[in-house]
Amino acid sequence: MMEPEEYRERGREMVDYICQYLSTVRERRVTPDVQPGYLRAQLPESAPEDPDSWDSIFGDIERIIMPGVVHWQSPHMHAYYPALTSWPSLLGDMLADAINCLGFTWASSPACTELEMNVMDWLAKMLGLPEHFLHHHPSSQGGGVLQSTVSESTLIALLAARKNKILEMKTSEPDADESCLNARLVAYASDQAHSSVEKAGLISLVKMKFLPVDDNFSLRGEALQKAIEEDKQRGLVPVFVCATLGTTGVCAFDCLSELGPICAREGLWLHIDAAYAGTAFLCPEFRGFLKGIEYADSFTFNPSKWMMVHFDCTGFWVKDKYKLQQTFSVNPIYLRHANSGVATDFMHWQIPLSRRFRSVKLWFVIRSFGVKNLQAHVRHGTEMAKYFESLVRNDPSFEIPAKRHLGLVVFRLKGPNCLTENVLKEIAKAGRLFLIPATIQDKLIIRFTVTSQFTTRDDILRDWNLIRDAATLILSQHCTSQPSPRVGNLISQIRGARAWACGTSLQSVSGAGDDPVQARKIIKQPQRVGAGPMKRENGLHLETLLDPVDDCFSEEAPDATKHKLSSFLFSYLSVQTKKKTVRSLSCNSVPVSAQKPLPTEASVKNGGSSRVRIFSRFPEDMMMLKKSAFKKLIKFYSVPSFPECSSQCGLQLPCCPLQAMV
């Protein structure tokens, strides 16, 4: 058994380990390379009869636990909203866990209750919340409490709203059964609301309707008013609205200034879920999203996300604490005390009875950082997200389908959803960063959240390069396996194919003194302000042609083109007489030497399609190069990406030369 002196020694050892872990976490693989059940084989079938040594236990941290950990504190963890910690927070929980009080009533631990009340008032003022959410204000009958999660807070708010509405209905229908009254209740949220809102409706047996949002993914007053009127005509009783500030999918903000007056007029409980974005309201410049907050009956957010107070720690405020108490009050004799009814007993503000001393770590963090440093932390995360957004916008292969808010950027690879899905799969293989998908308007998107307080521009650039490399590989594979039939038509009509047939070398594209535009042209490029009209090529209006980057995204390309595309790329790489190092898909090798020369210019002029003539000169077995063989080819040999295209037109073509050159 461990004694105090050994605990002191082992405690130092553990603190050293934690410091080492958090200081070097960016060097670890973010996601583990394990399969479900990996731990079973590493543990004995039964618990030990005799105690293990601490050295054995401590050694198993790296041997057993860390190989299966997702490192949420890594700067390369971008999948979910943050779940940050900090040194003061860790110290706070160390003390709270040592005290280990269960502060269900004031009498069970006065410091637990009173510190929480004061810290929650601090936090409400820091966020700019209304005075009716304060414990200590002459005109307030509300206050704040720390819950375990926003999910639990939303359920508590819905249960309180349900109880209050049923009591109102009982005044006009005193003989009605409460279950019958409950069956008529209906609540509302946007279709972007968190899944916990749906779960709250299931638990409370209240119908939950998810309303459509506008083009900015925001729930507006018109949609809510229409739903209320329709439900009233059906005999339903509207009771509750959950407005989201910072949705999970795209960090959108519902319009409180429109929803609030409707809720006040119709007698609906307005609950605000600001789980992630709530921390941003520490900064005055982000409080525009709080316009209409005075109508809120309850408000919740997670300091355990972005405020560097580790899980669990959720702030929850109500305008009227008595509506909570009438919902959750049970008062057996063994929980009564001399100050019952005078002091605050938080057991009446929540579902469980027992509660942790969570306010210590929150108190430590606020005092250790101060408001100014917490604001600087939020601004830094937002600036890092802006930097990532700029990188995405400067790459024409990607698009940003929703406006960036705070530290979340959503983006996708242009084209069908399968491309974005495959990019995510490719990134997941290496585990060097962690991203997850979401969907908006049937489009698959990637969520990129700046999570760590230690994230730097170098971290962002490193992760962006990994994303772009994965996208380049996926686009190359897609163009190989599913070329668009329009690509071949364009190649046969535009004279750039003639340059290929004549054996144009890489050196003619990038050599000193050569004009890249003379060697090849882009099928279509973005039109700059003030730019002149596009040129005509072989009778074609180039501005009417589709962007080659978009043209390669056909999901229903004929199979007959696959072998020709593969063979052409193989031959193109094989005919270079003078080797030149180019950026490759998977290595820095150079193209292989030619086995046969390309046809001369004279032979090209003798009639027929130039594309057919090119392919006719190669051996039949080369023409039948399979998809699997081409994958091996691009694994071992360089495929040029011709980056100088971007310097001429601003369009970085991610695909093969077949799309890029004419």
From Swiss-Prot:
A Pfam family hit: Pyridoxal_deC
GO cellular component, one term: cytosol
Reported impact of residue 49 to V: In a colorectal cancer sample; somatic mutation
List of residues that carry N6-(pyridoxal phosphate)lysine: 305
Residues involved in substrate binding: 81, 194
Disulfide bond residue pairs: none
Effect recorded for residue 354 to G: Strongly decreases affinity for histidine. Strongly increases affinity for L-DOPA and confers enzyme activity toward L-DOPA
Pathway recorded for this protein: Amine and polyamine biosynthesis; histamine biosynthesis; histamine from L-histidine: step 1/1
Keywords for the protein's UniProt record, in alphabetical order: Catecholamine biosynthesis, Decarboxylase, Lyase, Pyridoxal phosphate
Required cofactor names: pyridoxal 5'-phosphate
Reaction(s) this enzyme catalyzes, per UniProt: L-histidine + H(+) = histamine + CO2
GO BP, sorted A to Z: catecholamine biosynthetic process; histamine biosynthetic process; L-histidine catabolic process; L-histidine metabolic process
Keyword Protein biosynthesis recorded: no
Domain of life: Eukaryota
GO molecular function per UniProt: histidine decarboxylase activity; pyridoxal phosphate binding
CDD domains in UniProt: DOPA_deC_like
Enzyme Commission designation: 4.1.1.22
Subunit structure, interactors included: Homodimer.
Family statement: Belongs to the group II decarboxylase family.
Protein purpose: Catalyzes the biosynthesis of histamine from histidine.
Name of the protein in question: Histidine decarboxylase
Organism for this UniProt entry: Homo sapiens (Human)
Organism ancestry: Eukaryota, Metazoa, Chordata, Craniata, Vertebrata
